């Protein structure tokens, strides 16, 4: 069951791109829940939460920039601290994930 869902997620090209990095699936989960819960977790905090196969910080930021350029994620100013930038998955991608996982948003 888990693997069926995982493979279905990987068929989505945006998710496949995120998961192209060793830490990608973990990053996807983090940003998904940050988006879903409207969490005030900044880019640096997101990086620090990665536990497995973490890249160097500059490579991580370059990957975030690439995902943003492709429209997969977006950056938003934190509602609590103007100097903090939070990451969000695109609404379209959130809908695709929720549909595959059969989650009501």
Region spans (language model):
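Short alpha-helical segments that sit at the start of domains
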Residues: 2-30
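Short amphipathic alpha-helical interaction segments
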Residues: 53-69
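A short, conserved structural fragment
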Residues: 68-78
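Amphipathic alpha-helical dimerization/coiled-coil segments
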Residues: 11, 98-105
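Short acidic, hydrophobic short linear motifs in intrinsically disordered regions
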Residues: 37-50
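Short amphipathic alpha-helical elements of helix-turn-helix/winged-helix folds
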Residues: 30-37
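Short, cationic-aromatic polyanion-contact patches
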Residues: 78-101
């Amino acid at each position: 069951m888990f693997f069926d869902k995982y493979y279905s997620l990987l068929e989505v090209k945006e998710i496949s791109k995120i998961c192209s990095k060793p830490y990608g699936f973990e990053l996807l989960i983090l940003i998904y829940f940050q988006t879903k819960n409207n969490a005030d977790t900044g880019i640096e905090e997101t990086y620090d939460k990665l536990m497995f196969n973490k890249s160097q910080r500059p490579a991580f930021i370059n990957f975030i920039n690439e995902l943003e350029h492709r429209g997969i994620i977006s950056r938003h100013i934190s509602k609590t601290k103007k100097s903090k930038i939070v990451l969000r998955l695109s609404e379209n991608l959130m809908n695709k994930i929720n549909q595959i996982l059969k989650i009501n948003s």
